[in-house]
């Protein structure tokens, strides 16, 4: 008969997510787990949409080196046409080279460029079909997001979305 110790040899990699921790701490933990497989993901950030004011607001982030370009920022969604396009398509946006936005006039575009980010994968967040915000995976590298990598990042993205929804419904 198998010993009890033999039955409990695996430690759940994501067990910390069950703990009573603030969302920012959970996001930072999960970001480190993601970086074990995808070390090029330098920043994970969440911006929430306030339907009443039509504003997009920074909610939380995890940034390697803790030097986020956008920590407390809000802007009308109408001032971000490329983000509005994501909502219209109801699909993530992949930008393998952020230089396409190098002539952007918006503050958030300038801040991201100033920190040296080269690529971005942006997922729209939905709760029961209603748009609630965006999840950004940023990298200091160009072209790091291969299709097989995106499949795995999507899983993390949906996990983060559920964490955000859980946090919002608890408030």
What are these regions (language model features)?
Residues 45-71:
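GAF sensory/regulatory domain recognition
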Residues 118-126:
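A short, aliphatic-rich beta-strand micro-motif
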Residues 96-119, 139:
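Signal-transducing coupling segments at domain and membrane junctions
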Residues 2, 138-155, 163-171:
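Regulatory loop-to-helix N-cap segments in sensory/regulatory domains
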Residues 67-103:
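Regulatory sensory and allosteric helical modules in signal-transduction proteins
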Residues 125-135:
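Short hydrophobic/glycine-rich mini-motifs in sensory/regulatory modules
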Residues 1-25, 166-171:
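Signal-transmission linkers at sensory-effector interfaces
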């Amino acid at each position: 008969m198998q010993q009890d110790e033999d039955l409990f040899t695996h430690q759940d990699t994501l067990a910390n997510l069950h703990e009573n921790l603030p969302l920012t701490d959970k996001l930072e933990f999960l970001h480190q787990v993601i970086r074990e497989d995808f070390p090029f993901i330098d920043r994970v950030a969440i911006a929430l949409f306030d339907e009443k004011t039509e504003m997009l607001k920074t909610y939380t982030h995890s940034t390697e080196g803790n030097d986020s370009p956008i920590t407390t920022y809000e802007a009308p969604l109408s001032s971000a046409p490329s983000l509005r396009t994501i909502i219209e398509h109801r699909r993530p946006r992949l930008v393998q080279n952020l230089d396409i936005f190098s002539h952007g006039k918006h503050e958030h575009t300038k801040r991201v460029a100033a920190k040296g980010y080269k690529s971005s994968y942006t997922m729209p967040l939905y709760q029961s079909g209603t748009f609630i915000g965006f999840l950004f995976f940023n990298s200091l590298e160009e072209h790091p997001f291969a299709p097989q990598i995106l499949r795995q990042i999507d899983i993390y993205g949906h996990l983060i979305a559920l964490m955000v929804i859980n946090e919002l419904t608890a408030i």
